[in-house]
Amino acid sequence: MKRHSENKKSGPVGPSQRQLRAGELIRHALVDILREEDLVDPALAGISVTISEVRMSADLKHAICFVEPLGASIAPQVEREPSSPSRTVVVPGSPAEVVAGLTRLTKFLRGKLAKTIDMKFTPELKFLHDETFNSATYMDRLFEDPRVQQDVRRLSDVAEDEEG
């Protein structure tokens, strides 16, 4: 599902108001379900999950839910198994494990969602890790780099010289 489609006359077109409204409705309902329900999946035990965005398909039958476990590290989500380097293992508590846990609970969550929201169809849910948190952290670290700060100061000095 594309975030932006192309319209021949006006260029890029984003999601419709209806898609945005339905996505927010589902996001709020899922947050309430995750907060109130006792989820039995071991991957979600003791972990708070943030649902940052829900993107709806044009027909509102599919929802992509972007999630981030609170307190998740930026460390790799998978590791190579020492005994078999070609086999990967999901790191406990990692975003990949949380997404896998939510995916296993999709049927349960969809059933609870059907009772909570008033829509003609309850959408199929797909969970993905939200990379924007990691991107923001990376940008913060990048701006703290002394070399980058030096370049920013140099550019601001050049801009001041051109003005005055």
Swiss-Prot record:
The record ties this protein, via Pfam families, to:
RBFA
- GO terms of molecular function: ribosomal small subunit binding
Provide the protein's localization: Cytoplasm
Q: Which residues form a coiled coil?
A: none
Q: What are the annotated GO cellular component locations?
A: cytosol
Keyword set, alphabetical order: Cytoplasm, Ribosome biogenesis
Query: This protein's superkingdom?
Result: Bacteria
Listed InterPro entries = KH_dom-like_a/b, RbfA, RbfA_dom_sf, Ribosome-bd_factorA_CS
Per the UniProt entry, what are the Gene Ontology biological process annotations, in alphabetical order? maturation of SSU-rRNA
Keyword presence, Ligase? no
Record carries keyword Nucleus = no
| Self-association and partners | Monomer. Binds 30S ribosomal subunits, but not 50S ribosomal subunits or 70S ribosomes.
Q: Which family does it belong to?
A: Belongs to the RbfA family.
Functional note: One of several proteins that assist in the late maturation steps of the functional core of the 30S ribosomal subunit. Associates with free 30S ribosomal subunits (but not with 30S subunits that are part of 70S ribosomes or polysomes). Required for efficient processing of 16S rRNA. May interact with the 5'-terminal helix region of 16S rRNA.
Name it.
Ribosome-binding factor A
